[in-house]
Amino acid sequence: MAAAGRGREQDSARFVYVTRFGSHQCSGVLQLGGRGAQGLWGQGPGAGCRQEKPREAMAVAGVQGGSELPLGSQLRVPTTPGVEAAASASSQLRASRVQSGTRQSARAGLIQKDAAKKYDFPIPLNEASKIMKKKKKVLVWNRVYKVISRMLEENEKYRHRLKCQRLSSESSNYTR
């Protein structure tokens, strides 16, 4: 009965919305732990939970903050040929560099995501030892629980066998 309750608790906290991962803006839903964990772009049971893509998140942040749109989404219309056209071309080149930088940071984010999968979720180092101790305690308790339950089962079987022996000896006394 207790195991079924624990399973429900784990299911309720399997997804976490993350706005940053280290220095990278990722704005997504992470699926935590277990065998079915797929991370940011998982195909698992949490695939129905959509996340914002980094560019969309930046655009939303720009709108909410009241600031301008990101460089990649600004309109570039040269007013006069010559200097403005060159400036526009350089700004477009800069914008493409920014976009390629976001792609590189997304790749770096994937590397960090893979590293996070290894440990279920990125955590500060000062909290890591506490969490590891807690996990060890849980693992030890699970083993102890199994041993205790086996002992109780054996005890019940032994009691049942003794009870049957007593009944059979009493019934044999009556038949004599």
UniProtKB/Swiss-Prot annotation:
Segments of skewed composition (Low complexity): 87-100
One Pfam family recorded for the sequence: DUF4680
Region (Disordered): 87-109
Designated name of the protein: Uncharacterized protein C5orf47
Gene this chain is encoded by: C5orf47
UniProt superkingdom: Eukaryota
